């Protein structure tokens, strides 16, 4: 089984589907505050599956999952050049977090996200 490629990850103030295209609104100075939208684009997607994004506290041994979203996608036997996913993530306190992007529980991508106080 081949896995898709994560080609884009953004945390946005707003995102909408306008005629099949993502219309994005970024945070001023890229200072993400809660609530926010997670936007993920996968390339080279085969078959169906479940994409999830999970947010974790810090980077130490005591790290724990604090939020997450899941998206079912695709059909068995089909190929998609790309698929875009987006949804709002609510109520994450200001701080530094790490996140992981998984397809069928396999980690494909991870990163760090700073959530700022609402100004």
What are these regions (language model features)?
Residues 10-46, 81-83:
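Contiguous beta-strand segments within globular domains
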Residues 47-51:
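Short beta-strand/loop motifs in extracellular/secreted proteins, especially
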Residues 64-76:
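Solvent-exposed serine/threonine-rich low-complexity stretches and specific carbohydrate-binding patches
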Residues 70-73, 114-119:
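Short beta-strand edge segments in extracellular beta-sheet folds
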Residues 76-80, 93-100:
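A glycine-anchored, Pro-Gly-centered beta-turn/N-cap motif
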Residues 87-91:
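Short, surface-exposed loop/turn segments at beta-strand-coil junctions that are enriched for proline
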Residues 103-112:
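Short acidic/polar inter-strand loop motif in beta-rich domains
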């Amino acid at each position: 089984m081949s896995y898709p490629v994560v080609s884009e990850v953004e945390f946005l103030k707003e995102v909408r589907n306008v005629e099949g295209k993502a219309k994005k609104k970024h945070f001023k100075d890229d200072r993400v505050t809660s609530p926010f939208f997670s936007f993920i684009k996968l390339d080279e997607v085969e078959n169906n599956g479940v994409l999830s994004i999970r947010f974790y506290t810090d980077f130490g041994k005591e790290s724990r999952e604090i939020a997450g979203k899941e998206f079912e996608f695709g059909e068995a036997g089909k190929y998609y050049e790309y698929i875009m996913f987006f949804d709002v993530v609510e109520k994450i306190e200001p701080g530094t977090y790490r996140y992981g992007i998984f397809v069928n529980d396999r980690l494909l991508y991870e990163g760090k996200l700073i959530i700022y106080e609402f100004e």
